[in-house]
Regions:
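Conserved ATP-binding subdomain of kinase catalytic cores across diverse folds
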Residues: 1-75, 122, 178
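Conserved kinase catalytic-core segment
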Residues: 6-24, 76-142
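Hydrophobic alpha-helical scaffolding
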Residues: 7, 52, 71, 89, ...
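Small/polar glycine-rich anion-binding or flexible loop at a beta-alpha turn
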Residues: 36-38, 99, 182-192, 201
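Short coil/turn segments at secondary-structure boundaries
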Residues: 59, 76-79, 96-98, 182-183, ...
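Regulatory N- and C-terminal appendages and interdomain linkers associated
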Residues: 87, 128, 172, 189-216
Length: 216
């Protein structure tokens, strides 16, 4: 992904946000920044639907699993994804917790673009499981005019989301509230590492401060 005039510093933003996820013990796809021919930074990831020798690995995104055409990728809810995970994952209880962790992380880091195509199940070996996270990005600092907080509704809401909404969604998804609260504490514990990563990132000083202000 190269730089874009419409949304400055997106490659640096996405690579940093993926590193923040790793610091919070969220599995993510392999990723990196690279220098492009014009000297600017670009963002790359490695495909996880191909094995080392090029064999195809089964992978279905949530548009496919919930029978939504791509143009309706925003017309669903987090709870609907949870239903698909419960129905198709080989390890649904674990994957539901991992899914909630990504939802919480995305909310805290200003990512309101986690639509149906940004969650997938794949089968790297014999079992279907939630794929490592991808397309993690702080949209709030890249596009501050967008006031929605979630791409997909949670507890019927896309904005003004509170802890109670995540806890209610946890109940709906079959996740114990204490587990969700534990995930939130895990994100809090990662905050010192996040601050270091942001301060040492390739973002401009202004963008660094915007990111720090958002998560503080």
């Amino acid at each position: 992904k190269p730089q874009t005039d419409a949304y400055p510093e997106l490659p640096e933003n996405e690579d940093l946000t993926m590193h923040l996820a790793e610091a919070a013990r969220i599995k993510v796809v392999p990723h990196s920044l690279i220098h492009l021919a014009d000297g600017s930074l670009g963002y790359i990831t490695r495909r996880i639907d191909r094995a080392k020798r090029g064999e195809k690995i089964d992978m279905e995104d949530m548009c496919q699993l919930t029978l939504h055409p791509t143009e309706y990728k925003y017309k669903s809810s987090c709870e609907q994804i949870a239903k698909a995970i419960a129905a198709y994952s080989s390890t649904p209880r674990l994957d539901l917790v991992n899914f909630m962790q990504v939802l919480l992380f995305s909310f805290v880091t200003g990512n309101n673009d986690m639509h149906l195509k940004n969650f997938s199940l794949y089968r790297p070996k014999a079992l279907y499981q939630l794929s490592p996270a991808y397309d993690l990005l702080n949209v709030a600092i890249a596009n501050p005019k967008d006031k929605e907080e979630m791409a997909l509704s949670i507890n019927g809401k896309k904005a003004r989301i509170k802890l109670a909404d995540f806890l209610k969604a946890s109940d709906t998804m079959g996740i114990e509230q204490r587990v969700t609260l534990g995930l939130i504490n895990g994100l809090r514990d990662a905050m010192p590492a996040w601050i270091d990563l942001i301060n040492n990132s390739f973002l401009s000083d202004e963008m660094k401060q915007n990111y720090l202000d958002l998560i503080s």
